[in-house]
Structures are given as C-alpha cells and as structure tokens.
C-alpha cells in the first residue's frame, strides 16, 4: 500500500495536470462579491477570485527588472490571452511584457516576484488584428501567446466567449467591467487594487448621435456606461473585459474588450468596447477552433443588427482614451495621461451624390421604306400595221418628186427614210 504522502502527491499531480489545460467551465466566479461592484472610477474593490480570467499586462524594464501595469487582458485558455491591439502601439517586442494571473492587488513598478496563488508568465507572441487601424481604433483586438502555459486554479480560470450564432448582446443583460486602471481621470498612476463596476449597454444609435459620439461608432463596437457618466473605465483598463450575463447563476460572457473613450466617466461619453462576437472566426483562425469549445450556448433570439462593415475613414488624430496607463518614467515616458477634451470630429457627412439620370430611351426604329412604284406598263409590242399597197405607192411617187414628210415633232430626212423604209416589192406595169 502506498504511503499517504505519495497518494497526496499523485492526487495533486492529476489535479494540476487537469488545471494546466484550463478545460474546466468558463465564465464562473470563484468568489462572488456580496455587495456588488458599482464603479471603477471612484469605485468598488473586487474580491480575490471575483474575476478569475482577469490578466494584468505589465511593461517590463530589463535594466532594473521592474514591472509596470499597462493594460488588462482576458484568459481564454492555458495558452492564450485576449486583449486590445492599441496596447502594443509603442511596445511590440515580446521581451518588453509580462503577464500576471490571479491577482487582486498589484504593485506598480515592483521588482519582486509574484507569490502563489499569483502566476507570472512571459509573452511568446503578439498577434494584433491585421486590419487594426490605430487612427480610428477599428479592429482593436489582439492575442498574446503565454509561455509557459499557465495552470488554472482557485483564482485563475478561463473566460467565456459568446456563441458564434448569438450576435450582439441584448441590452437587458447585467454587465460589469473590471481593471487596475485609473480611479479618476487625472490620477497619477493605476489603481493597485482590482476594481469592478456595473454598467449598462447603451444603444449604438444613441451612442452615435450628434451630442454623443457623432458617428464615430461602428457596428463592431459596443457602448457601455451611463448617459450621465460618473461610472466608467479609464486609462489602464484597456484590453480588459466587458462581461455580461442574462440571468443570475449563469456564466459571465466576455462580450467586449475595453478600447477607447473620451476622458473618464463623462456625461454622454461612455466607454467604447470592441465587440467579441464579430471576431470569433478571426480568434479561431489564430488559436484553433478547439480553443473556442467553451463558448456559451446560442441565444435563442436572433441577432438584431447586421454584421459590422469594415472601417471608418481615418481621422487626423487617434480617438484616445483608454490607452494603456503611463509606463515607467525612464527612459521612454508615455505622454501625459490627460486626454484631449473631445475626440476629433469626423468631417461632416456629405450628402450622397444624386443618382445618375436614366439613359434616354432608344430611338424608335425608322419607318420601313415606301414600296417601290409599280413598274410602268410595258410598251405595246404590237407591230405597226402594214401600209396598204396604194399608200406605199403614193409615198414612192412623192419621193420621186423630191418631197419630204414629217412624223410628229421629229424631223426625218425623206431620203434616209426612204432607205430605211420597208422594201417595196417591184411593180411591173402591164403594157
């Protein structure tokens, strides 16, 4: 019989092997917050294990081995993290990044290794969307490959993606955002504590109206927050999840990735998120379709909006403003975090050109040519009647006397006429 210690080691090894694949249920909170978070900006601290798929993406400085929180991310499985593409606008080298899993508290600028149950990992590969537009933040989505694979456990677990047939999320869902970003717009550095906030999904037509974002939002975005502001994501929350569920007890589904906004918690300037459902095929093409087996069942209600079109025309400036938090102050400090007071307004929409006039109708076919006139009646071919013998004899006598004759209006020489006349038979006078 094996000693108890050996059996315990075997059991732990089997559990660790199963957890290392992160094949368990997705979207489940290991510890619910009984108070329910209401804010990130000025908000409520999340308890450890409340959002086990949350990842802190940290800039690493080799000269002093320090790490600085910059963006959030979502754990999909033991090998991949989903985040925002704009986090890597200025930091694309894999050795510049570290990932911390299972954290509730983080220390900005620390050089200390993490302690269990937290896990620190390297970035093996950065995969940004091939049509990401840093000017408009279109297709603001990216994937990070984890090395070595991270094991799931009590405070680390995968997030759910929506079903490919579910379409856009319904507005009636309960949604949360979470992150270590700024707790107010002009904060000097990110929050050391994971914050959470409950937000409402806002209709895209309202969010795109003139007094709000004035046409900047595309069909591949989600708009979440409150019309009056006050509760919002902020700098340092980029790449983190917008998580929703329809009913109590159901798993949370990552419906969006924190992308951009104007300021933080401003009225009529809610947070803008990259919707995940339009990019499921792209994610599967990069990490394998098997990695999406944890997607929630399809929503019975058919989608209410069409799939996204492609891109907004580029503007003169980036739209800001949940860019990642300012990095280490030396040697390459990031710009001051205070955003521009308003996003660049896109040029006024021009009226569509009038449709070209219809082509003129084809001309009517020419009338058929008139029928040819009937041919004149053929000239009579009746031979002239022969002159009587007495008449011919009289004409001969006149010729012999030197006379001439006329036929109609045409003058005829009598000598030639006599030569052309019908030969007169010889007359013999009886003696």
Curated annotation (Swiss-Prot):
Start and end residues of each Peptidase S1 domain: 40-288
Keywords of the record, alphabetical order, are: Disulfide bond, Glycoprotein, Hydrolase, Protease, Serine protease, Signal, Zymogen
Annotated GO biological process: acrosome reaction; activation of adenylate cyclase activity; proteolysis; single fertilization
Q: Which InterPro entries match?
A: Pept_S1A_acrosin, Peptidase_S1_PA, Peptidase_S1_PA_chymotrypsin, Peptidase_S1A, Trypsin_dom, TRYPSIN_HIS, TRYPSIN_SER
Q: Residue ranges under compositional bias (Basic residues)?
A: 331-341
State a single Pfam family of this protein. Trypsin
Q: Its Gene Ontology molecular function terms?
A: amidase activity; D-mannose binding; fucose binding; serine-type endopeptidase activity; serine-type peptidase activity
Q: Which residues are glycosylated?
A: 19, 208
Q: Which SUPFAM superfamilies does the annotation name?
A: Trypsin-like serine proteases
Residues of the active site: 86, 140, 238
Q: Which residues form the propeptide?
A: 351-431
* Residue numbers spanned by region Disordered: 295-385
The reaction(s) this protein catalyses: Preferential cleavage: Arg-|-Xaa, Lys-|-Xaa
Q: Name one GO cellular component term.
A: acrosomal vesicle
Task: Tell me which positions the record assigns to the signal sequence.
Answer: 1-16
Instruction: Note the superkingdom of the native organism.
Output: Eukaryota
**Activity regulation text:** Inhibited by SERPINA5.
Q: Which family does it belong to?
A: Belongs to the peptidase S1 family.
Question: What name is this protein filed under?
Answer: Acrosin
Origin species, per record, is: Oryctolagus cuniculus (Rabbit)
């Amino acid at each position: 019989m094996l000693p108890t210690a050996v059996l315990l080691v075997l059991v732990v090894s089997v559990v660790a092997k199963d957890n290392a694949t992160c094949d368990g249920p997705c979207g489940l909170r290991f510890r619910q917050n009984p108070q329910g978070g209401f804010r990130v900006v000025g908000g409520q601290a999340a308890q450890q294990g409340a959002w086990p798929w949350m990842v802190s993406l940290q800039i690493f400085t080799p000269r002093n081995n320090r790490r600085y929180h910059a963006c959030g991310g979502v754990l999909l499985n033991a090998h991949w993290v989903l985040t925002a593409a704009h986090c890597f606008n200025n930091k694309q080298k894999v050795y510049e990044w570290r990932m911390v899993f299972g954290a509730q508290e983080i220390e900005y600028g620390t050089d200390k290794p993490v302690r269990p149950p937290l896990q620190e990992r390297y970035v093996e590969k950065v995969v940004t969307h091939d049509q990401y537009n840093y000017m408009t933040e279109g297709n603001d989505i990216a994937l990070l490959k984890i090395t070595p694979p991270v094991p799931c456990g009590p405070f680390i677990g995968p997030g759910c993606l929506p079903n490919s047939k579910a379409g856009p999320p319904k507005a009636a869902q309960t949604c949360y955002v979470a992150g270590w970003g700024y707790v107010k717009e002009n904060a000097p550095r990110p929050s050391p504590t994971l914050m959470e906030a409950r937000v409402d999904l806002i209709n895209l037509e309202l969010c795109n109206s003139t007094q709000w974002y004035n046409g900047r939002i595309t069909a591949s975005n989600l708009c979440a927050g409150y019309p009056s502001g006050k509760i919002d994501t902020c700098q340092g929350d980029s790449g983190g999840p917008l998580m929703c569920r329809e009913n109590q007890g159901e798993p949370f589904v990552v419906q969006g990735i924190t992308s951009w906004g104007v300021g933080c918690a401003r009225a009529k300037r809610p947070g803008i998120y990259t919707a995940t459902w339009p990019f499921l095929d792209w994610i599967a093409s990069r990490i394998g379709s098997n990695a999406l087996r944890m997607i929630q069942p399809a929503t019975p209600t058919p989608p209410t909006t069409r799939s996204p079109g492609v891109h907004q025309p580029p503007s003169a400036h980036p739209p800001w403003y949940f860019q990642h938090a300012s990095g280490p102050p030396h040697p390459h400090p990031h710009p001051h975090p205070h955003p521009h007071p308003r996003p660049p307004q896109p040029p006024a929409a021009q009226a569509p050109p009038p449709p070209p006039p219809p082509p003129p109708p084809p001309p009517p076919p020419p009338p058929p040519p008139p029928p040819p006139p009937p041919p004149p009646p053929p000239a009579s071919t009746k031979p002239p009647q022969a002159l009587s013998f007495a008449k011919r004899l009289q004409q001969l006598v006149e010729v012999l006397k030197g006379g001439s004759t006329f036929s109609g209006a045409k003058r005829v020489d009598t000598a030639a006429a006599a030569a052309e006349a019908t030969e007169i038979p010889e007359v013999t006078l009886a003696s």
